[in-house]
Design a protein with these regions (language model features):
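NAD(P)-dependent dehydrogenase/reductase Rossmann-like domain
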Residues: 253, 263-266, 274-388
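Oxidoreductase and adenylate-handling cofactor-binding alpha/beta cores
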Residues: 89-108, 155-162, 287-301, 336-340
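Phosphate-binding beta-alpha-beta segment of Rossmann-like dinucleotide-binding domains, i.e.
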Residues: 81-140, 301-306
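Glycine-rich Rossmann-fold phosphate-binding loop(s) that bind the pyrophosphate
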Residues: 146-147
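N-terminal Rossmann-fold NAD(P) dinucleotide-binding loop
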Residues: 150-151
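An N-terminal-biased, well-structured beta-alpha scaffold segment characteristic
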Residues: 2-3, 7-80, 194, 214-216, ...
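Rossmann-like adenosine-cofactor binding region
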Residues: 41-46, 169-261, 277
Length: 388
């Protein structure tokens, strides 16, 4: 069995069970593991042992993992996108209602009239209008980012009778299939800003999405827009959001990412990163990450990697050669020539590029020894070689 190290006490037991049931050696103190399974353990500044092949993150975000460093060391990093999508969708639904009607404020106010005895019913009738707010029915919701969560939010908003605009320049075929045809496609993010009474942002955090909602964006929106952010803190410029809330340009902001700046702003509902906090979601994330690690260790297949291309091949040969290398010309030719020069037949192969890197799986008609693997390791631009 493969040696796995769990770097987080918060990993769901279901994920660990998915590995131990298949004979993997799982412990929290493995010194030279072949794989790490983690949630929020911080890996920046860590020294990786040379045997480490893969890291599985139980969850979608991966800013606790030094991705470029891992890729250069030939370490595949997996995440589990979509495993917590249902949990986030349900919280976003709750957030849309809270952004509209002051449910939260009303609950606090009712607590405050405890002790008023028989007068409570009258006080309630008199005070309730202060917490009224518009219905979602018939309003326009703009969904920025139509991945696993965004598509679910768009679909459920349609069920509530909202008009839904969706914007996602990088939409996958899978997401397109999941999305209702009634979602209106926005050609630009500005279309979303102009048309929406409510905005839900569901994008990963990248250089391109940094402060996507900034002063310039708020200036293009309908006055009194209500915004929900359960994606990442950094996609919203908090200083600009504070100014927009103070001026009434934004009527309400619901965020899962509290910080000192935003907690001082008016009309904010801030939650303690509750998006994926359900037992079902934590189980799904851990099991998904564990299954992907196992398939990579056993078969060399890559699914849901954040740094290398998704690559899968059904096994056809006696032995499998897996090579992570830089995406440079003639790399595959050099590997295949080297193999055929030793009279070994190639039964099947696949090569996939991703930015500056690529991954090649070759199924061979005969077993190869470590000497051949070492010769391929010694080639320029090769980062990792495995024989399975």
């Amino acid at each position: 069995g493969s040696e796995m190290c769990i770097r987080d006490s918060s990993i769901s037991p279901a994920g660990i069970e998915a590995l131990t049931a298949r004979g993997c050696d799982v412990s929290a103190d493995e010194v030279r593991p072949e794989a790490l399974l983690l949630r929020s353990a911080e890996l920046h500044g860590c020294e990786f042992n040379p045997e480490l092949l893969a890291i599985g993150r139980a969850g979608a975000g991966y800013n606790n993992i030094p991705i470029p460093d891992c890729t250069e060391h030939g370490i595949v990093v997996f995440n589990s996108p979509g495993a917590n999508a249902e949990a986030v969708k349900e919280l976003e639904l709750c957030s849309l209602v809270m952004a509209s009607r002051d449910v939260l404020g009303s609950i606090g106010w009712v607590r405050g009239i405890s002790g008023e005895g028989a007068a409570i019913p009258k006080l309630v009738e008199k005070g309730k209008s202060a917490f009224a707010g518009p219905e979602l029915l018939g309003k326009a919701l703009g969904v920025i980012g139509l991945g696993a969560v965004g598509a679910l939010v768009a679909n459920i908003a349609l069920e509530l009778g909202m008009t839904v605009y969706g914007y996602d320049p990088f939409m996958s075929v899978d997401a397109a299939w999941r999305l209702s045809r009634e979602v209106l496609r926005a050609d630009s993010v500005d279309d979303i800003f102009r048309n929406s009474d409510y905005i839900s942002i569901n994008v990963p955090y990248t250089e391109q999405t940094h402060h996507m909602l900034n002063a310039e964006a708020f200036a293009k929106m309908k006055r009194g827009v209500r915004i929900v952010n359960e994606s990442r803190a950094e996609v919203v410029d908090d200083e600009a959001m504070t100014a927009a809330l103070e001026s009434g340009a934004v009527a309400k902001y619901v965020t899962d990412f509290p910080n000192e700046v935003i907690l001082k702003a008016p009309n904010v509902i801030a939650m303690p990163h509750l998006g994926a906090c359900t037992p079902e979601s934590e189980d799904r994330c851990a099991v998904m990450a564990a299954n992907q690690l196992y398939d990579y260790l056993l078969n060399g297949n890559i699914k849901n990697s954040v740094n290398l291309p998704d690559t899968s091949l059904s096994r056809m040969g006696v032995c499998r050669l897996c090579v992570i290398h830089r995406n440079v010309p003639r790399m595959i030719t050099r590997i295949l020539d080297f193999i055929s020069d030793r009279n070994i037949n190639v039964e099947h192969m696949i090569n996939k590029p991703r930015d500056k890197y690529a991954y090649t799986i070759v199924d061979l008609g005969a077993s190869i020894g470590e000497d051949i693997a070492d010769s391929i390791r010694a080639m320029d631009n090769v980062l990792r070689v495995r024989v399975i």
